């Protein structure tokens, strides 16, 4: 087909000539293209164009309401977890209050709703025998402050509720934990406001 893929390369600019995108600037080098497609965040893609070619201003983007971001925790346990399904929703707090904290008055929710996923319940290859892999997701407003201290505070909040609802202690059985949040969505995926 004559297609050439450039991987692990950050695009610095979309080069437009005569109202047509004709090349990309990658690592200071111009790479010609017949067609340019972007699967990146719309805002980020626009920032790769010269300002006079952008369809929307920064003011436009600042006023938009975006889909939620999230705080994700990837967790490994050295035991099997009881009283959960592969997909488990913890909607034991007020949905309207959490939604308000995402869309109307963006801030960290006091009592967040969260989702827990235990892939090792249905695919044993995702954790060693007798252990469990999981991830937890808290929907958040995009663009809010993101610090390690806030992440830890919210991990403890959801673990308190998780242990209470499922009737078991699990924190002492955590052998791996990693988080991914607003800052990471921005830096990894160029997601506007994370």
Residue ranges and their predicted role:
Residues 1, 161-162:
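Residues within well-ordered alpha helices
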Residues 43, 47, 128-161:
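Conserved FAD/dinucleotide-binding core of flavoprotein oxidoreductases
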Residues 163, 167:
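C-terminal substrate/ligand-recognition segments
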């Amino acid at each position: 087909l004559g297609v050439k893929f450039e991987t692990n390369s950050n695009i610095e600019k979309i080069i437009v000539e005569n109202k047509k995108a004709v090349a990309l600037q990658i690592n200071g080098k111009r790479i010609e293209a017949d067609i340019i497609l972007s699967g990146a965040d719309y805002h980020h893609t626009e920032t790769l164009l010269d300002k006079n070619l952008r369809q929307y201003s920064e003011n436009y983007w600042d006023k938009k309401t975006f889909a939620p971001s999230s705080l994700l925790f990837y967790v490994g346990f050295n035991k099997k977890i009881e009283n959960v399904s592969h997909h488990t929703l913890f909607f034991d707090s007020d949905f309207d209050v959490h939604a308000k904290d995402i869309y109307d008055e963006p801030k960290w929710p006091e009592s967040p709703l969260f989702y827990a996923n235990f892939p090792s319940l249905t695919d044993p290859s995702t954790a060693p025998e007798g252990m469990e892999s999981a991830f937890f997701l808290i929907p958040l407003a995009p663009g809010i402050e993101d610090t390690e201290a806030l992440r830890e505070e919210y991990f403890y909040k959801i673990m308190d509720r998780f242990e209470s609802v499922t009737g078991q202690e699990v924190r002492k059985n955590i052998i791996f934990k990693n988080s991914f949040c607003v800052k990471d969505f921005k830096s990894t995926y160029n997601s506007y406001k994370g």
